[in-house]
Curated annotation (Swiss-Prot):
Involved in IgE-binding: annotated span: 24-94
Provenance organism: Sesamum indicum
Protein function: Seed storage protein.
Annotated family: Belongs to the 2S seed storage albumins family.
Signal peptide: 1-19
Protein name as annotated: 2S seed storage protein 1
SMART domains found in the cross-reference section: AAI
Subunit structure: The mature protein consists of a small and a large chain linked by disulfide bonds.
Residue ranges annotated as propeptide in the record: 20-38, 69-76, 147-148
Domain of life of the source: Eukaryota
Listed InterPro entries: Bifun_inhib/LTP/seed_sf (IPR036312), Bifunc_inhib/LTP/seed_store (IPR016140), Napin/2SS/CON (IPR000617)
Stretches for region Immunodominant epitope: 46-55, 48-57, 76-86
Lineage of source species: Eukaryota, Viridiplantae, Streptophyta, Embryophyta, Tracheophyta
Length: 148
């Protein structure tokens, strides 16, 4: 009976250790507007707003709100290529400047298109673009409402 109790205690302890070893911790880093102390150094970089592929990708995504989702394979291939290059452009921006660069791009898109509903949809995509590109910091950028 004592051996049975010991074996049962060992099995219980092993199950407890196994269960705690399989915990998953998900960390999300969000950069808020004005939160980064180093954003002052981003002014030059964000004023440039030279993220040509990101702009092209956003324009191609904009087309999905206007057209049917049934687009040609060639158009989808071009869209993917712009997305991939957009991620590369975003990686080239200093990590603490990425959100400001995305906000700058959103301001340009707003001047170009200005449609409230469409811009809100684009803004949601831009908020999560760092995560979509597989970046560890920031994983998302808070965007101020474009239309209030």
């Amino acid at each position: 009976m004592a051996r049975f109790t010991i074996v049962l205690a060992v099995l219980f302890a092993a199950a407890l250790v196994s269960a705690s070893a399989h915990k998953t911790v998900v960390t999300t880093s969000v950069a808020e507007e004005g939160e980064e102390e180093n954003q002052r150094g981003c002014e030059w970089e964000s004023r440039q707003c030279q993220m040509r592929h990101c702009m092209q990708w956003m324009r191609s995504m904009r087309g999905q709100y206007e057209e049917s989702f049934l687009r040609s394979a060639e158009a989808n291939q071009g869209q993917f290529e712009h997305f991939r290059e957009c991620c590369n452009e975003l990686r080239d921006v200093k990590s603490h400047c990425r959100c400001e660069a995305l906000r700058c791009m959103m301001r340009q898109m707003q001047q170009e298109y200005g449609m409230e509903q469409e811009m809100q949809q684009m803004q949601q995509m831009m908020q999560y673009l760092p995560r979509m590109c597989g970046m560890s910091y920031p994983t998302e950028c808070r965007m101020r409402p474009i239309f209030a």
